[in-house]
A protein has these predicted regions:
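Toprim catalytic domain recognition across nucleic-acid enzymes
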Residues: 1-392, 396-423, 428-433, 440
Length: 441
């Protein structure tokens, strides 16, 4: 096709990203083609987006740096892989695969497993007071059982506590950011039990069906030129999922062009409003619901609550009770409507009674509670993706951009490759699956 006499120039329509740029240019060079080529850069497969893309084809030279970055990545992978794999295979007398990304990720799981194996649980005790004012207050953790039992006996003997301090702080949680691929994969693993690869496959299929924008993005913001069309997209998204109640839309919360690289954050498209969502496979439908819910939440208002801490004294020991009152549901209203059946059931926080400082309060009962410290948790795909995303962040100098290990589009591939090599795998069922090192890993 490149060498046909009726072809004057070529349009690079490969994936709009670093690896897509590399794939095209490797084919172009291998074919020995010298004809000029331009770049089609798309973030959506909708017809209007494709037409706009062809109307604004970019010179290929604008993407030379992207190609060079991909070429460096490819050669670094090859040099590390072929040299280190041969070295360690010879040293240990068996085939061992070493990779620029796979090996550090495997090391994370090995270090975590070692910490779990070496962990020795420690017992601790607390004394809980049931106050007649209507709340439960707990002591600090006590390592010695005798000391805890002595405190319990003293409290049962005294049966009176004095309210020392009551503090009330109003707090808020801002709406979550829009999804990039990694954040979507983490939530899909945590809420749906999907592996990172399953989520990527579902998202890719939705993209090809023109129901979401480009999935392999590492941005969680939108560009300024998208602000005008966003309210309409929010309305269409709410309508597609029968969530049509009017609510304040704060577009500027998700607009920041300086934080958009190759692609903006993941979004549903306007085509979704006309699609038969019930006909989608269940996995795709659930991933689409996550992406849509995140859009509706991201433009919402803060979740506001008041947190009250009560400190009381009994038998010379401090006891603490905490309570929480929701002042405004904000974006959590939309989250509950869109994802209610997927969200984990959390214990409702206690509402503390209205009490005054320095007043005495009777103790209705006192009880000894026993617990023990917990080992570090096994990685799940959710927490492993987060560890990859934030790798070495603590040791990086201030002001240095933190990139982590791997890219959103290939992080799941490294875990899958380690599994195929017999170096790691998942244990457990569905959402509780842990990632652990196996065999040679």
């Amino acid at each position: 096709l490149m060498h046909r006499p009726d072809v004057d120039s070529i349009v690079n329509s490969c994936d709009s990203g670093r690896e897509g740029e590399l794939i095209f240019r490797l084919v172009y060079q291998q074919a020995g083609c010298k004809k000029p080529f331009s770049r089609l850069w798309l973030s959506s497969m909708e017809e209007n987006a494709i037409r706009e893309g062809f109307a604004r084809l970019k010179p290929s030279t604008e993407y030379d740096a992207l190609y060079n970055a991909a070429l460096c990545r490819e050669r670094a992978d090859w040099m590390v892989g072929i040299n280190a794999s041969r070295l360690f295979s010879c040293l240990y007398g068996q085939p061992l695969a070493v990779g620029r990304v796979m090996t550090p990720v495997l090391a994370m799981t090995v270090v975590r497993e070692a910490a779990i194996a070496a962990f020795v649980p420690q017992k601790f005790y607390t004394v809980e007071l049931e106050l007649t004012s209507g709340c439960t207050a707990s002591s600090r953790r006590i390592s010695e059982k005798d000391a805890a039992e002595n405190l319990l006996a003293e409290c049962r003997k005294e049966m009176i506590s004095t309210i020392q301090k009551v503090t009330r702080k109003e707090k808020s949680e801002n709406p979550p950011l829009l999804y990039d691929l990694t954040a979507l994969q983490r939530d899909a693993n945590r809420l749906l039990g999907f592996t990172a690869q399953q989520t990527l496959d579902y998202a890719q299929s939705l993209y090809e069906k023109r129901l979401i924008t480009y999935p392999r993005t590492d941005s969680r913001f939108l560009t300024e030129d998208m602000a005008a069309s966003l309210p309409g997209l929010v309305a269409d998204t709410g309508g597609a999922f029968a969530v049509e109640e009017p609510f304040p839309i704060h577009v500027q919360q998700v607009i920041n062009g300086s934080k958009v690289n190759d692609h903006h954050a993941l979004l549903p498209t306007k085509s979704m409003a006309k699609a038969d969502l019930a006909a989608l496979p269940a996995g795709e439908r659930n991933v689409l619901r996550l992406i849509s819910a995140r859009l509706l939440c991201a433009v919402g208002e803060p979740y506001c609550y008041a947190e009250t801490t009560l400190t009381t004294i009994c038998a010379g020991e401090e006891f603490t009770a905490k309570g929480k009152v929701v002042l405004s549901e904000g974006w959590k209203t939309m989250e509950r409507k869109m994802l209610g059946e997927l969200l984990s059931k959390q214990k409702e926080p206690a509402v503390l009674p209205d009490v005054q400082e320095q007043r005495q309060c009777s103790v209705a009962g006192a009880e000894l509670k026993e617990g023990q410290t917990s080992a570090p948790k096994h990685f799940t795909e959710d927490t492993l993706l987060h560890a990859m995303e934030t790798a070495s962040a603590d040791s990086m100098p201030e002001g240095v951009e933190r990139q982590g290990i791997g890219t959103p589009g290939n992080q799941s591939r490294y875990h899958r490759k380690a599994g195929a090599e017999g170096l790691s795998g998942t244990e457990g069922q569905q959402k509780d699956q842990g990632v652990a090192a196996h065999g040679q890993g």
